[in-house]
Amino acid sequence: MENLPTTYDGPVHIAVIGGTGLSKLEGYVPVAALNPTTPWGSPSSPLMIFEHNGHAVAFLARHGLYHQLAPHEVPARANIAALRSIGVRTIIAFSAVGSLREEIKPMDFVIPDQIIDRTKGIRPFTFYEGGVVGHVGFADPFDAGLAQVVEKCASAMKGDGVVLHNKGTIICMEGPAFSTRAESHMYRSWGGSVINMSALPEAKLAREAELAYQMICMATDYDCWRDEAGEDVDVAMVMKYMAANGENAKHLVGAVLDELLKQDNSDLVLAKKWQGSAQGAVKFMTKPEGRDPEAMKRVEFLFPGFWEQN
């Protein structure tokens, strides 16, 4: 990585945020390592630019290059802002999850369509504060168009019995400790499908930044609700299944990228659906007399030229 250029002039509209089990893009050649700074600090890792068949994709390691950042320490605002600043408009995020449903087996994949927030306010979770207020819609936290692309690519996975579930509700907990048994049963009663520590505020910030965002989840365990000896989740169990099914994770993400890079998906990749959604929410809230200059600069970083139009 030391010998890679630190600038890249070509368009980069798609990014992959890798979590536990996905640390690189197979078949892609690294061509640059960018180190942008944002008003919210530096991202978790350099933004690695990879090329494949003439197209560029950015890759960011959510927990750092050496997995040194706990879930509540991930600089999610810097991550999302840095990706947008280089031109990214679509994010495919990957996460290992615990299953809260019998039918979602370890090594199965899930395309979630909903989230329940069980974080505790420790993580900074909005771009719009400190003198500029914006209330952004989040009823459907993931991008339905991206979800359809992921589902279409299910055939890229290899092996008997590998299943891709086309919807589900993520419980996003604070961590870093796993759930108690009582909590796990409670989450099941709420209709939770899987549980992780990474979906928020990442998905919410992507929406505030007008990015198309979809998480791909791979189940590694049954959390601790099954009440059977030896089945309670621990790190060794998570890593065991990630190692066993890591190739399928890479195959699936690779197939999704190939599909997104087709011309037919250009509007989807450019997040045309979300353009103006957050800016409108900001524009009509805080009156000019109450706007803090520093907060205005932060919004300008996300949307250059914003205040000239508003």
Swiss-Prot record:
Alphabetically ordered keywords of this record: Cytoplasm, Glycosyltransferase, Nucleus, Purine salvage, Transferase
Residue sites binding phosphate per the record: 20, 62-63, 95-96, 198
Compartments where found: Cytoplasm; Nucleus
Biological process terms in GO annotation: glutamate biosynthetic process; L-methionine salvage from methylthioadenosine; purine ribonucleoside salvage
GO cellular component: cytosol; nucleus
CDD domains: MTAP_SsMTAPII_like_MTIP
Binding-site positions, substrate: 197, 221-223
Primary localization: cytoplasm
Family: Belongs to the PNP/MTAP phosphorylase family. MTAP subfamily.
PANTHER family in alphabetical order: S-METHYL-5'-THIOADENOSINE PHOSPHORYLASE
Protein name per Swiss-Prot or TrEMBL: S-methyl-5'-thioadenosine phosphorylase
